[in-house]
Amino acid sequence: MAYRNVKYGKKVERRNYSKIIYDVDLPNLIEIQNKSFNWFLKDGIEELLQDFCPIESYNGDLKIYFGECYSTGPKYSVEESKTKDASYVIQLFVKATLENTLTGETKKSSVLLTELPLITDTGTFIINGKERVAVSQIVRSSSVYYSSTFDVKLNKNLYSGQVIPARGAWIEYEEGSKEILYVKLDRSKKIPLSNFIYALGFNNREIIEKVFGKSPLLNSSFVKEEDMDTGNALIELYSKIRQGEKVPVDTARDFIRKRLFDQKKYDLTTVGRYKFNKKLDVLARAEKTYLVHDFVNLETKEIILPKHTFLTKDKIEILRKNRHFLLQELFDAQHNLENETDEEILTYKKDPQSRELYIKTNILNFRTGEIIFPKDTLVTDEVIKRLRKSIQLLDGKVIEFFLRSKDVYQKDLERTGVFNEILEVYLSKDEHDNLQHKVQIVGNNQKETKKHITLSDIIASISYYLNLYEGIGNVDDIDHLGNRRLRLIGELLKNQFRIGLTRAEKHIKDMISVSKFSEVGPGELVNFGFLNGVIKTFFANSRLSQFMDQINPLAELTQKRRVSALGVGGINRDRAGVEVRDVHNSHYGRLCPIETPEGPSIGLIASLAIYAKVDDYGFIQTPFFKVFVQNGASYVSNQIEYLTADQEKEEIIASSGYELNSDATFQKDKVIARKNGEIGIYPKEQVTYADISPKQIVSIATASIPFLEHNDSSRALMGSNMQRQAVPLLVTESPIVGTGIEYRAAKDSGSLIIASQPGIVTYVDAKKIVTSDQEGNKKEYQLTTFEKSNQDTLILQKPIVSLGDNIQKGDILVDGPSTNQGELALGRNILVAFMTWEGYNYEDAIIISEELVKNDVYTSVHINKYSVQTRELKKGSGKEEITREVPNVGADAIKNLDERGIIIPGSEVKEGDILVGKITPQGNVDPTPQEKLIQIVIGEKAREYKDSSLRVPYGEGGIVQSVQYFSRKNGDILPPGVNENIRVFIAKKRKISEGDKMAGRHGNKGVISRILPKEDLPFMEDGTTIDVMLNPLGVPSRMNIGQILEIHLGMSAKNLNIKVATPVFDGVNDQDLKEISQEANLELDGKKVLYDGRTGEPYENRISVGVMYMIKLSHMVDDKLHARNVGPYTLVTQQPMRGKIREGGQRYGEMENWAVHAHGAAYTLQEFLTIKSDDIIGRNQTYSAIVQGKQLPKPNIPESFRVLIKELQALGLYVELIKTDTKENEVNKSLIDYKKEGYN
């Protein structure tokens, strides 16, 4: 038989039906976030601080430098932070140096940077005692993008381009009318492309044509050519950006230079530079073209490739190795727009190879005209020091160049020319020697590492745009994962730090500009309060910082692997189209095509696929087996390589259904494989990679659905989403029919305790486990017992190891909520029959056995927290007190309170019971002596205090599980004005009942409609009664046939007393199912004769019966069932409040109105719309009439109509409301007026 027995952990063995040869272990499922946070802590912060370094005063006298960062450990442990409602944070410090540039003196000290929340081992943050998760954001990568649209009128493709940085100005190219190409800089008005090229420094048309070639479209873009040069072009570009403002050439040049090439304003980031170099590489465009000229080694004059060579991949590699011969200098350092203008450059080199710099012009005392340093003076440290001492006498340009920001030598090194790689090609063989048809391909300088855009990049991006019209280059698919990347927690925090530091920089600059070096140090000048505020706001309010979904381990794990396109810098949910939401072929093995929300966020929130990793640039990778050819045979090796979507493009990858021989060679000569996202059939010799596993396409939640391949995609989506809503049960049970990932999902979720070192268990109880290694080193593990989760469910860890057990590093030591023997256990294995029963399971309703209720099969425990605080009241009013002496209540109400007035743990409480007795002073708390005497004699404390006790809210109750008491007297840290804080935790057992929602793993959800006694239930020939009856009509239309296969396999496995693993796309097939059914002595159709429990007669037809794994969802009737007799009304509309928590009414909507109309219940309808809703006068009159036994009055004007009138009056409209009998205008009549007229 096609299976093997596999052990999962030390406790569970499953019969695994997987067919693949190599069973690759899953990577750590939550390491992505921790790795990113650790990078930020180690390198990211210091990198960022260097971008802001130094901060100098406005006159340049003082500078602050930031050095090494270090941190101090968290004040509280993870558990203490949760208990005390504190944040789990570290304090970050930075070593700061204050320098006096005039004297060279320095002062050093450490400065508090911020309090930074620290990530826990399980990938969460604790903010104010609550666990939160930072969700990764998927965004468009900074790069150069080109797109095309087909113009029906012109019958041709129109191209557009965008140069997009992480921060800074965008450059956009587009084609306008009359075939003129235009450019927009930073979303400004457009200018002709030719003018933009002039502005870059090209002074005449001949030079432009020499670089870009004789492109017809570029020629048509030359407008107003006769008076156009670099200066005029710069002025025009400045005018477009600044909305018509006119300035001199130098000002315009400096403005454009700072807008595009200033590192503080323009940032590509490392990934942006990588993408720019990859996109603008001249060799990436040159493939499948012909060389115009011989490609020559300029040093030896040897011909590397002769002219007319057809550039194949091999020839491109030869060019790549000799690419330095493609470089041409387009501008020297003096004419490079990136560099500062001539007037600002006060140095030059006598020898270009030397490091020596000389002053270019005389440096004068601008007050007297006296020469301080003549030209040709060698620039030394002594010269710089003398200049600093004479700073009051120097011209602003001299100060700017010699004494501000960067070192003068560094400035000179940065003054470089513009180099581009240029290649001339023909598109076809027929065009050889026809110079009119040659195409110029200009690429950027591939050695460039700058984090901002360069002139070389801009020139290359223009060339790429022109090449598109000539048939060279490719347009980009923005939804391809090669162009989208993840911002992990490290990068998200770095962006927040940048915002905070930008705000702090201005404040620090203002401070040091008004301070004297002798009077202050770095500690007094540097204040990073802005940074602290930004970090707190991010963790508390950002869409990417989410309250942790702790209801079960799968929900926890899925949230940590979630990917969101929403949030700051992401996509707006309201404007997102179909394309960005849709499944893309590049998602294969990277993002799950199934798991996504069903509402307005569909497609914008996704989950990482099961094997997916993230590279250093943030691109999602997926693993493949490398395929080798040896002795003429292609074989799949066990060598694993992780590829991004871009790297995968040109590879031919065998899809996961390939069949292998025992020596790992392909069985068939042709293999189904993918190339560029398209599926085709390829000879096995051409295949370069093979899928690592059939399940690599889906996420963890989706991979836990057995027989996924037999379900409709929308039902699979519901199945994966509903598993995350499973409530932890009192008694857990792992599925008989699993998929093999239950163990790993539970282990990596963070809800279990994993052994951190090998050893032998020396002590075990319900609260701790102690292990000892060979050297005698002890390790203690504290268990979590009876704690409340974020979703108010019970967290209880139970040991699964015994005294003397030998454990290894990585072993699971305990079971937590929804786990069993270290495996994920969200529900229970129950006996299911697909049959109808008196119509009670119509429309997905579910009938269950009373035995499930009696035996606590689906019983769950829920814990609610209630808290109360005592405060100092305003001056002279006293303070609130916790006491047992609550006024105006009987002895029965306080019988379960201790001497302090706090409920005793273990007490059973119901709605309205006092949990904490509290009194609040009211009125005058300083009575006269006579009043004091009366109070002492009579004991009337009730008159001066009111009862403000904490009571069990409406609809709640249970057993008091624990009480926490915090007091300022005991040294606990409490908010200002709070003296005491008491928390009461109430646990409640919820048995399954009518109205609760249940589901299988195949999207087969339903609500319990009837709980039948055991004696009424259908039973099998051996007397076994059915646990659950499901409607068979729920299967064909939903097309989730997986549930039928599951019950057949489950029944066989239960009879054989085994557990089964059937991995998705690679599990039990038709033949396997037949064989295991025969092994279990079951009928091949999986049907049985059932007998009616009421009559004992057999049903007419045989019925499908089997074992299905069903879960109880968090949508429980106890949370939703609600009725209202009387209750509060909203103040404005006077209609009943909404919601159970406010004791609100049920919504009476349009459809309910139609139903009452149809029944002809006129008076009921009138009452619904008037006296039972918002007719204030009418409801008072009705109350009086009922009490006095009179006839009910006619309704009056509803309050909502009065609200409408007030809104019309607020618009300035004159409204009259004339009463027919009195002819009075009642529009402004108040309720008081009505009372005076006799309405009660």
UniProtKB/Swiss-Prot annotation:
Q: Which GO terms describe its molecular function?
A: DNA binding; DNA-directed RNA polymerase activity; ribonucleoside binding
Q: Which InterPro entries match?
A: DNA-dir_RNA_pol_bsu_external_1 (IPR019462), DNA-dir_RNA_pol_su2 (IPR015712), DNA-dir_RNAP_su2_dom (IPR007120), DNA-dir_RNAP_su2_hyb_sf (IPR037033), RNA_pol_bsu_bac (IPR010243), RNA_pol_bsu_CS (IPR007121), RNA_pol_bsu_protrusion (IPR007644), RNA_pol_Rpb2_2 (IPR007642)
**EC number(s) from the headed UniProt entry:** 2.7.7.6
What PROSITE patterns is this protein classified in?
RNA_POL_BETA (PS01166)
Q: What class of enzyme is it?
A: transferase
Q: Which UniProt keywords apply?
A: DNA-directed RNA polymerase, Nucleotidyltransferase, Transcription, Transferase
At the top level, the lineage of the source is Bacteria
Please name the Pfam families in this protein's record: RNA_pol_Rpb2_1, RNA_pol_Rpb2_2, RNA_pol_Rpb2_3, RNA_pol_Rpb2_45, RNA_pol_Rpb2_6, RNA_pol_Rpb2_7
Q: Which Gene Ontology BP terms does the record give?
A: DNA-templated transcription
Give Gene Ontology CC terms. Answer: DNA-directed RNA polymerase complex
The protein's annotated catalytic reaction(s) are: RNA(n) + a ribonucleoside 5'-triphosphate = RNA(n+1) + diphosphate
**CDD domains reported for this sequence:** RNA_pol_B_RPB2
Record's keyword annotation contains Transferase? yes
User: Could you give the subunit structure recorded for this chain?
Assistant: The RNAP catalytic core consists of 2 alpha, 1 beta, 1 beta' and 1 omega subunit. When a sigma factor is associated with the core the holoenzyme is formed, which can initiate transcription.
Functional summary from the UniProt entry: DNA-dependent RNA polymerase catalyzes the transcription of DNA into RNA using the four ribonucleoside triphosphates as substrates.
* NCBIfam families cross-referenced by the UniProt entry: PRK00405.1, rpoB
The record's PANTHER family line, in alphabetical order, gives:
DNA-DIRECTED RNA POLYMERASE I SUBUNIT 2 (PTHR20856)
Q: Which HAMAP family match?
A: RNApol_bact_RpoB
What does the sequence similarity comment in the record state about its family?
Belongs to the RNA polymerase beta chain family.
Write down what this protein is called: DNA-directed RNA polymerase subunit beta
What gene name is given for the protein in this entry? rpoB
